[in-house]
Swiss-Prot record:
Organism for this UniProt entry: Helicobacter hepaticus (strain ATCC 51449 / 3B1)
Family recorded in the similarity comment: Belongs to the gamma-glutamyl phosphate reductase family.
Class of the enzyme per the UniProt entry, highest EC level: oxidoreductase
PANTHER family: DELTA-1-PYRROLINE-5-CARBOXYLATE SYNTHASE, GLUTAMATE SEMIALDEHYDE DEHYDROGENASE
Keyword NADP annotated: yes
Matching Gene3D superfamilies: Aldehyde Dehydrogenase, Chain A, domain 1, Aldehyde Dehydrogenase, Chain A, domain 2
GO MF entry, a single one: NADP binding
Protein name: Gamma-glutamyl phosphate reductase
Keywords: Amino-acid biosynthesis, Cytoplasm, NADP, Oxidoreductase, Proline biosynthesis
Catalytic reaction(s) noted: L-glutamate 5-semialdehyde + phosphate + NADP(+) = L-glutamyl 5-phosphate + NADPH + H(+)
PROSITE patterns on file: PROA
S-S bonds: none
Function: Catalyzes the NADPH-dependent reduction of L-glutamate 5-phosphate into L-glutamate 5-semialdehyde and phosphate. The product spontaneously undergoes cyclization to form 1-pyrroline-5-carboxylate.
One GO CC term, this protein: cytoplasm
Amino acid sequence: MQDMVAMLILAKRSARILERLSNEERNAVLESMADEIESQCEIICEANAKDMSVAEHLPLAMRKRLELNSIKVHSMADSMRDIAKLHCSVGQVIKSWKNKAGLEITQVSVPLGVIGVIYESRPNVTSDVSALCFKSGNVCVLKGGKEAFHSNVAILKALHSALEQHSLPKECVSMIEDTSREGILEFVKMDKYVDLLIPRGGEGLIEFVKHNATIPIIKHDKGVCHTYIHKSANLDMALNVVLNAKLSYPAACNACECILLDEVLVEGFLPKLLTKLREADVRVMFENEVWLKNWGIADDGLADFSKEWGDKILNLKVVNGIDEALEHIAHFGSAHSESIITQDEVIAQTFMREVDAACVYVNASTRFSDGGEFGFGAEVGISTSKLHARGPMGIESLLSYKYCITGNGQVR
């Protein structure tokens, strides 16, 4: 039985060791981690097969996120190498000045310390998060879902092999083995040892952590993302963007879950939009029975505007203009990613200014809300919080700062 407190004490100690490493030393370890993941690919895939063998009861979207193969494992290793190549400002001077007493004050970037990450079903998160935390000089403590337990253990063993090669403590990357709710409850109260907690997963997990954690949290909440098609939109562009935002990966948190359509486009554009969605086997959920009766087919239904479907299901609401669209997003959006398709520059700027979300798009798919697409290599999560980080969280989001003050005997 794992002693969580003992493990976290060692993790806290490891943070001091990790902070002393140079950027070049951290990069060398990351390269070794990538090599170990590739060399243990067969072992990792066998462990994943164990998880998949008891995953029949899971939704299809979750099973897809859970499944690994040799291509995905090699992609995980490549992602770690990409992270090693990224710039990291840890230990660098942000700014410096002299105060009226003659003190030299320097603001220096530093790691946060020990970062806990709670996540579900995606084994690649184990390697991505470990790499981002290690690159930024942070220790990470992982709490994966029980559905990916064997996969995560196998990946962790590969990472520990690399740490051992470089004479570093394995607690630089640790995992909470207790997969129960009681285990999560114990973990989220360990503020004595953990500096930041990042929960990423379903609404139930986020709410549980929010209401029980004593550790400061940055939440990766659900993605109820909208695409608003304004009356001035290039309609071919609108079709392409909507189809990409919904279909390129329906289970992603940055997938579109609701289309807002200006009412003047109903007669000329809605039939074409519905045809394209149905050709792709998308179920359309309408605002009320009248819309469903007039425009729906057998598989369609009534909208749930608060729901993250994570599937080939899409809410549709007709609005009378940008004010109603903005009001709808303000009420039902999850502060993740929102997009408008428009040729009207004034409307575009209004949307960008007034939508309260981590990522706000004009004439582009919400699917770009991703650490890799933003040039961060990967992401620890996509923050829907406003403090300390927002949007895709890369290396720089895992840093804080301290003030280094030099004097020559000043007293106050």
